[in-house]
Design a protein with these regions (language model features):
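Beta-edge loop/turn motif
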Residues: 59, 122-126, 130-158, 180
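Conserved C-terminal RecA-like helicase domain
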Residues: 61-136, 167-173
Length: 189
């Protein structure tokens, strides 16, 4: 769609030039939108409107975990879905500490995914997401690179990231790489 109003609004709000990328051909076209709704409200609406799984991209691992924690009281999955998740993870060994936190998130239909996690937890989240058992995945840009997981909606909490030295604005290519996790051919057609 026409994003010229969004481009002008971003330039006005940030004082920085905005680039509009056009002409990208995708097997599953993406829709872009901007919302000022509180995040919890937006997430509940996306799940209710069958736009889950939602991948919520955070600039830091800490923010991803905090967001997942804040959503555990939301009713994202039905009782039947919760039982299906419990059956799927019944034989999985969660360590104490962060492992029990991951388990709590998963049973609420929430995944967490970032580079600081043990690979076994990241693989579990990826497997559950591929099975359609998770409604929301909170993470950094790690899920946005090289992993084929069915994501219907990508929600950015910020258009910045820490690059190891400083926090900077995402490059257009990085934004499109992460946003492109939604609408994957073969998963969401």
């Amino acid at each position: 769609g026409d994003v010229s109003d969004l481009s002008v609004g971003l330039t006005t709000a940030t004082g920085r030039p905005t680039s509009v990328i056009t002409g990208v051909v995708r097997p599953v076209p993406l829709e872009y939108s901007w919302s000022m709704k509180p995040d919890h409200e937006a997430i509940e609406e996306l799940v209710a409107d069958q736009k889950a799984p939602v991948y919520i991209v955070h600039p830091s691992q800490k923010q991803a975990v905090e967001r997942a924690q804040s959503m555990t009281s939301m009713k994202l999955v039905s009782t039947e879905e919760r039982h299906a998740i419990a059956a799927e993870i019944a034989g999985f060994r969660f360590a104490k500490g962060f492992g029990s936190t991951v388990r709590k998130f998963i049973t609420a239909g929430i995944g967490i995914h970032h580079a600081g996690m043990l690979p076994k937890y990241r693989r579990l989240i990826e497997t559950l997401a591929q099975q359609g058992k998770l409604k929301v995945i909170c993470g950094t840009d790690t899920l946005g690179v090289g992993i084929n997981v069915p994501i219907r909606t990508v929600m950015f909490t910020s258009l910045t990231k820490f690059d190891g030295r400083r926090t900077r604005v995402l490059k257009s290519r990085e934004f499109h790489q992460i946003a492109g996790r939604a609408g994957r051919a073969g998963f969401d057609t």
